[in-house]
Structures are given as C-alpha cells and as structure tokens.
Amino acid sequence: MPKDIEIKVLIKRTNIDVKLAEKLVNVANEVRSNYMSGMLSKSVSTRETLACAELVVDGFSILDAVDFVISNKYINNNYNSEYSDVKKLIVGF
C-alpha cells in the first residue's frame, strides 16, 4: 500500500496524529524494505500498523507500541538476531 494511503487509513481508523502516523508507517516501511531485501524473515502488515496506532492513541509511546506489536514477532530461538535488528530500526526513528 502506498505510504500516503496507509497514513490516511491509520488516521481515519484510529484518529492518531498525522506526525505519529507518519512515524509508524516509516518504521513499518523500513521493516518491509529489510524483509524484501532478505534481511528479515517476516514483514509488517497494515493490520499491524493499525494495532500500533491504536496503542499509541491509548497512551503507549510509539517505541513501546512498535516493540509490542512488531518486534515481538521476531522473538523466537530462530529469530533472536532479527529481533535485535528490528529493535535497532525502531530506536532509529
């Protein structure tokens, strides 16, 4: 989904602030890019960015919301290095 459309979806469905929606989509797109290049084994869906946005609207920080919804997908014996990689991406935003 194009970035601007995903941002609009987040805003419409959750009433999240525009700047926060942009940050969430930027993080998601960075993870998606790493998935497409083979650096990660899983991608991020719009449903997951919506879940992050809902948590942010409910009072979570972006960092905590993305960590809870996205980073935790990579916690597994096989993906611990991916978890670390995703955490680094998140902290960069």
In which residue ranges do the predicted regions lie?
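C-terminal regulatory/interaction module of P-loop NTP-utilizing enzymes
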Residues: 1-93
